């Protein structure tokens, strides 16, 4: 009724009253150039908007509640692409130009396929071709270095870490998986296999409860999972000391959901670290600017 009363029942009317479109230069999805893009990005007339919203909502933020949560320290870990990744990015750019120019049927190639390949390539070159070598400077190896360093440093406290990755989930068919690669490398360095677990292994509520309990006790010290499976409802914060975002999800709210697993009431650590890994000159840069 309030929207109708103020002639705001149609989105165009609401958007012109409270929103503003902004045109800015941003990276192209394939990561090789820039373009001007107009987005619905700013709000104004905020007092009127909030007054209208508060007619149907009672707002309490975490800051207003003053919940005792740890202080988070964010670290952006940027790595250089391999020569093979650079070549593959160039190939993605060529594909994108053909798609934009209408030179290829959408059933053969399209921007969705290209962006999906771009996400995989930014994660690890073996995602597109598992016959390619393990690049020493990859963000997967940078992540393994940090996980192991923190695992070793916090051994006396049995602190735990979460590793988020939405792509390349565990597989048993012999194909390359980032999950399997990270666990294998940690075990090779001396981390007990029982301390590195996948959320996907807990395929029932009973198994999930047991896994969460072991993580809270410090028996499982590295837990890997996707935002969908290890986001909302995952309460393992008791000993969490670090969180690793190996890839970037599509929605900013998913990053908040991930961080909410460690920046959480009940965490015994006053300070925690959140690492976000980016492969330069790839689709990672496009995703994080969104």
Task: Describe each model-derived feature in a short phrase.
Residues 2-133, 149, 274-290:
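Inter-lobe coupling linker of SF2 helicases/translocases
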Residues 7-10, 167, 251:
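Alpha-helix N-cap recognition
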Residues 67-230:
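Conserved Helicase C-terminal RecA-like lobe
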Residues 187, 191-286:
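Conserved RecA-like P-loop NTPase helicase motor core
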């Amino acid at each position: 009724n309030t929207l109708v009363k103020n002639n705001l029942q149609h989105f165009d009317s609401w958007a012109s009253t409270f929103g503003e479109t902004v045109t800015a230069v941003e990276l192209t999805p394939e990561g090789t150039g820039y373009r001007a893009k107009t987005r619905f990005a700013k709000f104004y007339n905020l007092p009127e908007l909030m007054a209208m919203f508060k007619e149907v909502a009672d707002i309490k933020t975490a800051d207003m509640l003053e919940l005792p949560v740890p202080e988070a320290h964010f670290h952006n870990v940027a790595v250089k692409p391999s020569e093979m990744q650079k070549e593959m990015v160039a190939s993605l750019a060529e594909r994108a130009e053909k798609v934009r120019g209408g030179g290829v049927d959408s059933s053969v190639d399209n921007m969705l396929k290209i962006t999906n390949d771009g996400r995989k390539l930014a994660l690890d070159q073996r995602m597109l071709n598992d016959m390619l070598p393990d690049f020493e400077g990859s963000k997967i190896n940078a992540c393994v270095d940090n996980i192991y360093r923190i695992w070793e440093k916090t051994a006396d406290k049995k602190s735990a870490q979460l590793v988020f990755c939405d792509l390349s989930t565990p597989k048993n068919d012999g194909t390359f998986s980032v999950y399997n690669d990270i666990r294998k490398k940690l075990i090779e360095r001396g981390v007990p296999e029982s301390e590195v677990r996948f959320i996907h292994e807990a395929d029932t509520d009973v198994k999930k409860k047991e896994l969460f309990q072991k993580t809270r006790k410090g028996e499982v010290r590295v837990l890997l999972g996707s935002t969908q499976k290890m986001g909302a409802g995952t309460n393992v914060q008791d000993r969490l000391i670090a969180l690793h975002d190996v890839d970037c999800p599509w929605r900013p709210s998913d990053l908040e959901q991930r961080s909410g697993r460690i920046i959480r009431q009940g965490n015994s650590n006053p300070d925690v670290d959140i690492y976000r890994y980016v492969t330069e000159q790839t689709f990672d840069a496009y995703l994080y600017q969104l």
